[in-house]
Curated annotation (Swiss-Prot):
Subcellular compartments: Secreted
Name assigned to this protein: Uncharacterized protein DDB_G0281701
Main location: secreted
Key words of the record: Secreted, Signal
């Protein structure tokens, strides 16, 4: 039983090592796609130094909160 667990652990460690080393190998076929994904993620981040807004969509929680606030503000304005 212990030998089986050790072999499984070695196999999983090898799989993780192979994936990590492939991610950092510039000649790997998926490396270009990884670079493109990293660049896209970086371009979506807001530039905090310049105070630029983020291009990312808002979180669902924030969208729901804003919608509730708008509804409440609409009710308040009609009540007056």
């Amino acid at each position: 039983m212990n030998l089986k667990l050790i072999l499984i652990a070695i196999f999983l460690a090898f799989c993780v090592f192979a994936n990590v080393s492939a991610a950092f190998d510039p000649s790997h076929p998926g490396a270009e796609r990884l670079r493109e994904m990293r660049e896209r993620i970086r371009s979506e981040r807001p530039n905090k130094r310049n105070g630029e807004p983020s291009n990312r969509p808002e979180s669902p929680e924030k969208m729901i909160r804003d919608l509730r606030n708008r509804k409440q503000n609409s009710r308040n304005s009609h009540a007056n």
